[in-house]
């Protein structure tokens, strides 16, 4: 099987989940066929699986717009990146305060075609 370069891609920005949690789920479906990946993400019970599945479905829809056969598509790359970080203050004893970081993420899914 020869693999061509990236055919289609889709992305989502500023998702309320940390990159670390998204990377755990993205590792399940990297370099897998699209049909297998959608089933894996559907039955994974993590919130991150739902976020990645939405972006994957968007990439599949983009592939259909180009008239590509979905059975020959595989996930070439899933890129998880850092987005903005909200910083909050959590009051502690004796007048102290700790900082709490609320992290956001970006997802990019690139699909390739198996020839």
Curated annotation (Swiss-Prot):
Matches recorded under InterPro entries: Ribosomal_uL22 (IPR001063), Ribosomal_uL22_bac/chlpt-type (IPR005727), Ribosomal_uL22_bac/org-type (IPR047867), Ribosomal_uL22_sf (IPR036394)
GO MF, one example: structural constituent of ribosome
GO cellular component terms listed in the entry, alphabetical order: cytosolic large ribosomal subunit
UniProt-listed GO biological process terms: translation
Keyword Disulfide bond: no
Lineage: superkingdom: Bacteria
Gene3D superfamilies: Ribosomal protein L22/L17
Entry-linked Pfam families: Ribosomal_L22 (PF00237)
Entry keywords, A to Z: Ribonucleoprotein, Ribosomal protein, RNA-binding, rRNA-binding
Job description of the protein: This protein binds specifically to 23S rRNA; its binding is stimulated by other ribosomal proteins, e.g. L4, L17, and L20. It is important during the early stages of 50S assembly. It makes multiple contacts with different domains of the 23S rRNA in the assembled 50S subunit and ribosome. The globular domain of the protein is located near the polypeptide exit tunnel on the outside of the subunit, while an extended beta-hairpin is found that lines the wall of the exit tunnel in the center of the 70S ribosome.
HAMAP family: Ribosomal_uL22_B (MF_01331_B)
Subunit structure and binding partners: Part of the 50S ribosomal subunit.
Family as reported in the entry's similarity comment: Belongs to the universal ribosomal protein uL22 family.
Descriptive protein name: Large ribosomal subunit protein uL22
Species per Swiss-Prot/TrEMBL record: Wolbachia sp. subsp. Drosophila simulans (strain wRi)
Gene giving rise to this polypeptide: rplV
């Amino acid at each position: 099987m020869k693999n061509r370069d990236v055919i289609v891609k889709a992305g989502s920005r500023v998702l309320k989940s940390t990159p670390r949690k998204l990377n755990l789920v993205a590792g399940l479906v990297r370099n897998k066929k699209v049909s297998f990946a959608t089933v894996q993400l559907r039955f994974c019970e993590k919130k991150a699986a739902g976020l990645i599945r939405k972006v994957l479905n968007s990439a599949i829809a983009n592939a259909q717009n180009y008239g590509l056969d979905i059975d020959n598509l595989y996930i070439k790359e899933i890129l998880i990146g850092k987005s903005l970080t909200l910083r909050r203050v959590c009051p502690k004893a004796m007048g102290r305060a700790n900082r709490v970081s609320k992290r956001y993420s970006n997802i990019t899914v690139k699909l390739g075609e198996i020839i």
